[in-house]
Amino acid sequence: MIYLKILEKLNQAIWLFDINKRVLIWGNQSCKKYKNIESITSLFNNSNLINDIRNGKSKHEHIDIIESNENGEILKQMIFKYSSIHISDMDARQLYLDTSINLLVNQDSHYLDYEGKRIFILVEAIEEIKFIQSPLSSSIENHNINNNQNNQNSVNINSSNKGQYNRPEPSNMGSWEWNVQNDTTKASNQFYKIIGIENDFNKKLNFNDFINKLGIQEIQPIINNCIESNSSSFEYPLRINRKNDNLVRYIQLKGEIIKKDDKVFKVLGVCHDFSEIQEAKDKLEEESKFVEALIGCLKAGIVACNSNGDLTHFNKSAQDLHGLELNDKTDRKQLLDQILKCYRSPYEQINLEKSGTPIIRALSGEFINDQEIIITPTSNQQQSSLSKSNRPRSQSNCSNGNKSQNRLSKNYSTTTTTTNNNNNNNNNNNNNNNNNNNNNSISQQQQTQVSTQQTQQQQNTTNGIGGATTSTTAAAATITSPQQIPIATKIPTKINDNEFLVLASGQEIVSKDGKTIGAFVALHDITERKRNEVILKNATEEAQRANQLKGEFLANISHELLSPMNSIIGMVGLCLDVAPRNLKEMLNDVVESSKILLDLLHQILDFTTLESNSLAVRPFPFKLRDTFNQLFKVFYTRIIEKKISLTFSIDPNIADDFYGDQNRLKQILSNLIDNAIKFSNSSNINNSISIIVEQLTHNQFKKYKDSFRSNSKTHSRLNSHDDYSIDGDYDDQDNNDSYFGRDINVSDNESAVGGFSELDEKDNSDDDDENDDENDETDENDDDTDDDTSSNTSRNNISNNLLFHNNTSGGGGGGINKREKFKKKDREGFVNLKFSIKDRGIGVPEDKHDFIFDRFFQVDGSYSRVQGGVGLGLSICKKLIEFFGGAIWFESEASQGSTFHFILSIKSVEAPSPKSPSLQSSNGSINSTTKLFESSRLKNEIYIPSLPNVQTKKVKKDSNDNGNNDSTNYGISLSNSMNNININGSTLNNNNSINNNNNSNDNGPLTSRTPSNSYYNFIASLNNTSLKSSSHNTLSSSPTGFNGISNLNISGLNNLSNLSNNPNNLNNIIGNTNGNNNTNGNNNSGISLNNSNNNIQTPNGLNNSRGSSLISTPSTKNVKKQHSCPMDLIQRIHSICTPRGPISKECGLNNLPAYSPPKSPGRSLSHGGKNYSNLISTPRGGVGYSSPPINSSSSSGGGSSTNGSNSGNSSANNSTPSSSSLSSTPLTSSNTPSPVSISSNNVNNNNQQQQTQPILSPILPLKDNSIDISDLNNINSLTPNSSNSTSTNVTQSSSNIINNGNSITIINNNPVTPNGKKIVIVPLLSLQSASSPKQSQRGYSPKQQYSPKQYSPKQQYSPKQYSPKQQQQQQQQQQQLEQLSGRMSPHKSNLSSTNLHHIHHHHIHQQQSQQHNNTTVHSNNLILNNNNNNNNNNNNNNNNNNNNNNNNNNNNNNTTNTSNNHTSDPSKSSNSTPETSPPISSPRSNNNNNCSLTTIVGVTTPPQPSSTITTPQFQSPPILSGNSGNINLLSSNGTSSGGIEISGSQMIPQKVLVAEDNTMNQKLIKTLLTKRGFDITIAKDGKQALDFYHESKNKSILYDCILMDIQMPILSGLEATCAIREIEANEGGHIPIIAVTAHAMKGDKEKFLESGVDDYVTKPINPKLLYEVINTQICKYIEENRSSSTINENKNTINNNNNNTNNNNNNNNSSNPVNNNNSNSIDATQQELNNEKIRI
């Protein structure tokens, strides 16, 4: 207590404050001059200040305090320092008991009952800052002058006047005095400074002069009014301009009138300069306006009130929420009551009590944070002060409330509240001192309905400080917080349409002295958000249910999908064992397609399994190198195809025996190797794949895993919100380590991550192997018993045993020491492996790196992408690796290749694992289960079978094993150079270097380990292996089973005719290259297999000439839509092709897309391996065709070769002009009719040998008697069959005919058999189009056909060009045709059946046209084929040479055959009859048409050396169907046929371009359309389709229809379609394009039709629907293009040829082709025919 005595005598004011009771208990003598000590106590209501002081921190605070002195009371601003002190209990008692201590509290307080330390706060006045109020204000304000005290007051004032003006005054305060009796004025020096003038003390001024000098004349009337009103004081504010500097100053004049003897004696006054205060007020008012505007603009509703319950702020958003309005006339207190009635709980249907409303809770000191409440707007409330607002919520720049009423800017003193316990209505009488020093008594009644606590009442303590009585009051009106609503346990109620769900946030507003001056609440409308959350929640739940159902569906459907696929593959495999050779190819295609589908199903099911956390791990012992052996066996053929050099390197220190799920490891490696092969570039000379397996230390493994571990979800472009991560223990445990998981179905406390599985706790102690004991000697003795039982326990508990491991602790229990020991031993029992697969493929662009592991992501996802797939492979790999506790990453650069790395920790076992049943077979076939690549004694050596040019490579690598001196790492190298392999027949005949000696030297481990005949067995058996389909067509197209051999050119081998019958004979010819494992490695057998299609060139002279058609004539007026080609597509086409021709002006370019002339489509006839001994049946209503090979004959002057362009296969083959071609492959499938071809030497005018093209000849189906050409080895068997037979079968190729010595004799240019049987001869008339420039922009319109006036008499055929001998030959030919055709009389016609003709339009390639010069193309003479001598008779129609009118059925056939002459002399045709009708232009040809007649025999005949072939090759035969005169593409049985019926009996094959990249689909579509007689051309991508289209336009042989696949490499189907439509828009015409695609989702059809296609057929293809669509589209454009003008012209042509009608068959074979001018009228049949034609 001694220091208290010392503090009491200090001049500084010091107080002592009890921190626990929060009362001021003591003060020294210096503090007695300060009156408002309650302002000090109010600071201790701040809990933060109390805590800081309690913790020993010193605080400095600014406090406004009133000081009482002899001059009165002065309001000062002081700085007080707060610090904590500790007082013992004894001192505290002495403090409270000592009456001499200046205690500020009552001593009867029970402070002695407090337990613990006494902590007091010492408050020390540090510094006085400045005066706040004038020293006279308080005295004037509180001084009352009564008439009874005038004398005494007068004396006091007189006694104090002496030193009044000499004492110092504040700088902003001045005083003045007016002696009324003497009329003199005095003022202080500070007063003059405020006014801005100098004080003249010597000069006496009266009052008028004084106020005039100062410029305050306004004060005089105020004083006069005050005197007259008997008032004692006055106050008046002034705004003046200071005299010396003209500054605006705000002053306030205050005065007091002193009377003496009821007379005014003096007027005392002060002048207060409050300019700084006024400026602060102005600034505050500006800020207040800014705040008002800001609050009004907020979207959230703001509700604020002061401590008296008056509403201060209510912005526009809040008004809309509550349905109320605030204006100047609104009673704010009543408005607040209305606001409180709008709230209700979101969990109940009743309104909140006022105590629970946010504004009341905030006013009571509670912090409101996002409380959900429902606001029900006030309705039907018509009051003068309140109005309902139903306007929509909007932001408004408005300032709310009365501007003059700013409650927040005032200082309120503490309110004394009297609480009535029986009533909640409290009357609060507050005495407040405002800044204007007005005595205002504010009586406020605050109505509340809240449950309140009784507030503490501060006792008024009378203290002797300056003799004054201090009334200390403490405000204590505290409102208790309402009960908290347990939101989590309640269910939200429904929100009505007229209600709002809001989030309320608010708090109280506290003044500087700690008083609560108000509160505010912000209301955020979340109604829409909540509704959207409900919708989203329902949608999420629905999606989760759908996802669950999807997973269950896929899990259940897996059996239903895999079972039929297994049946399909199995049954087809059984069929392969017994099927004939011609069906095996198609069955193999079925197997390959089924396996592709099966692989896709497995991928989808695996991904679904990983997604649904139902992955089952099936561990078993396996050998690592055997795993790679099996993978190399699967991918070997594809490696050969893509010409990849594969290098496999494995660390020799890595053991071979492991325990885990081998199938999952193979799945990961298979996906990565498959991608490396798929995206490799075969044209790259450095095309290679490198596979490296390394062993990592634990630290390296951990470093890789921490660096590349996926810590977040993969990027997803469209489904980023989906989380498909495995629910495993992926969190960081023990430095991001965790054990590899067991089966997913284990319990949750056992971590399902890590290598493959984790041991149970009971297995933890049993898993100590020998390596563990060696590395941990301290545990050796303790674990001997466990080691003895470890093998049995770990083997029996396979599902719970460790497979792959991640070097961390897993789940389970057990002690700490045992667990630490388990972790150490597990790390030692696992091997950390790093796998790297490096390729030199296309790489991954940098911007796609983040998405490469996303599901369904593809680097190129466009329709024109080269590689297929669904984009699940890498995603499955990533999920599997992460599921097993590993990590995967990659390094890639565009066009430089990619390297994929992944790490796994795999359980290593010492004991040799038992052999899998799948590895016990010893069969050497690749189809067996024997390892393809045998492992040597060294674990790191793996070998492959010996193949030509396949080398083994040593990969040297520094070994990381300590103490291991073997630094050589032997790896395998699969160097695929099959592109250099070629089989050369001449080499086989002349080079007898094939050595079967068993004593040859080995040239390496590859040769030594290859079994006998392994080369053939290996290659031939690849057809049956489960390999994925390659993008190349060569492997699947080889009929001999030699996948990879696409071309067999055997030029000098005469004894290979039986090779096709027995493919195994090729081994006898080639020889045993291995020689029972002792074959000389340096032996060169001269055998090479060419697997490259890039170097194949079409020989000179082989042209793919196409016939014309009357279909798909381009029409300008029928093109309804203009398909504009996008600029990016044009740029792509320009980058692919070379410029040629003009382009549409709409595109802004001057050149058409590039169309380099493609190679003639088709497959070579010299495709060795099979003979033509298969039966080909003719479809109903059609003509059977066979495609015999071109035989080599020693008697012929030169061999012949074919172009092999049948069915539009795009791969051509090499052939030499002087070599014979062995034809052994059918041009069509086994169930498809193949055209019969006859080839002979083609000699031009210069007697130069040229290669010829096969001629496809139709075999005429006879309606009554048909010739069964079933065995050409015995021609005597050619006898007519029964009348019901409609098919002709060709059972043997012409090569066998020659070998067996059979021959066909040509009698009168007609073939007959040795026994005199005649062969059916069908004359084939074709229109040849000369190449000529376009006549107009749209040169394909039917209106541009030649009229009869355009033909001169010289262009007509003259009878003189046929000699009598030739006419006689023609008559004999017609007679033979009659005998063979039997009763082939046409319906509704009296004409002879021998007059049937079949029209076929064709075109000769420009190159062939140049070779023939004026013989075929530029000549209008009749060209006769002396070899074939065929007259094609269709329904008794005799075609005149120049009258090629489709509607003229009665024209005489005035053609004769010239022997040994190929062209007619133009001079001999001068006597032609001018009345003949002109030929009709073909819609697929240009305007300059030349007519030629070619006869094609129905069976094969020996080649004639002296004949010249001028007829081009036809891909498919014409079809005979029906006799209707209408255009019809349906045969008599209602099925679609590939020809158009003309003149009731003539059919023209339709040319169809098929754009398809899939080989299997190419074969299917080709077979389907060829069966119906369509002429097919196959394009393997969009660019080639565009090339073929452009080539057809250049040759004026347009396609009738295009079947366009959508997704194709280089150019997609949509891009090719857009380019074709752009060309048509520029040049005219329109060709039907039918989309044939597997894209069958909603919207695909509309998108395709919008791009320019005419129709749409989905895959799998429905043949009936495909025929119907083709028929509809072709007929549609035929009807549009064949305008009425053409029909009228044909009608006139028929009328002009009425005189040429011949009713007798004798006129058909007339020797002189003269016009018969018979006067007979057209018979009834002709009239009916004309009527039918007119109806078209």
From Swiss-Prot:
Purpose of the protein: Acts as a receptor histidine kinase for a signal transduction pathway. This protein undergoes an ATP-dependent autophosphorylation at a conserved histidine residue in the kinase core, and a phosphoryl group is then transferred to a conserved aspartate residue in the receiver domain.
InterPro entries: CheY-like_superfamily, HATPase_C_sf, His_kinase_dom, HisK_dim/P_dom, HisK_dim/P_sf, PAS-assoc_C, PAS-like_dom_sf, Sig_transdc_His_kin-like_C
A Pfam family per the record: HATPase_c
Stretches assigned to the Histidine kinase domain: 556-908
Composition bias, Low complexity: 143-161, 379-389, 413-469, 790-807, 961-971, 1080-1096, 1186-1195, 1202-1258, 1340-1376, 1425-1475, 1482-1492, 1506-1520, 1695-1722
EC number(s) per entry: 2.7.13.3
Residue list for modification 4-aspartylphosphate: D1605
Composition skew (Polar residues), residue ranges: 392-412, 1097-1117, 1330-1339
Any one Gene Ontology BP term: chemotaxis to cAMP
Gene: dhkI-1
Domain Response regulatory, first and last residues per copy: 1551-1674
Domain PAC residue range list: 234-286
Keyword Transferase on entry: yes
Name of the protein this chain belongs to: Hybrid signal transduction histidine kinase I
Biological source species: Dictyostelium discoideum
Domain PAS: 287-358
Catalytic reaction(s) noted: ATP + protein L-histidine = ADP + protein N-phospho-L-histidine
Domain of life: Eukaryota
